[in-house]
């Protein structure tokens, strides 16, 4: 029996499957870089992503190893925080986060993963109080931590994260 044609077919199928995954991964990286540029364009004093600010503990910090699911959950929290801010500066970034989460879902799907829906997350109870007390600090801390998280996600995408 001749296996050579089957081997060629298999290598072709592997290549065809890898292309969409790579396209989604490249698009995701490009959007992350765009969001980081938008954050840099907003002139705020830089705050360390590791710095603790009272009342803002619900805003995710840095996570060294992220799965696609954890990336999506983290971005969902940031999206929720940014959409709660009245600042016009963060509207486009919040929209970009929604698009980024959609790309992560496509990337997960292309890897035969399914990400849980996180669109119905509960709003952190302390968010309204913090926003009322200090809008500016919340925006600065959220954007600073988001930027750090996006850099982590970018690095994780280079090593092909798990589901």
Swiss-Prot record:
Role summary: Key player in the regulation of energy balance and body weight control. Once released into the circulation, has central and peripheral effects by binding LEPR, found in many tissues, which results in the activation of several major signaling pathways.
Location of this chain's protein in the cell: Secreted
UniProt keyword terms in alphabetical order: Disulfide bond, Obesity, Secreted, Signal
Annotated InterPro entries: 4_helix_cytokine-like_core (IPR009079), Leptin (IPR000065)
Major site of localization recorded for this protein: secreted
One GO BP annotation of this record: negative regulation of appetite
Pfam families: Leptin
GO molecular function: hormone activity; peptide hormone receptor binding
Protein name: Leptin
GO CC annotation, single: extracellular space
Gene, per the UniProt record: LEP
Disulfide bonds: 113-163
Highest rank taxon of the organism: Eukaryota
Signal peptide location: 1-18
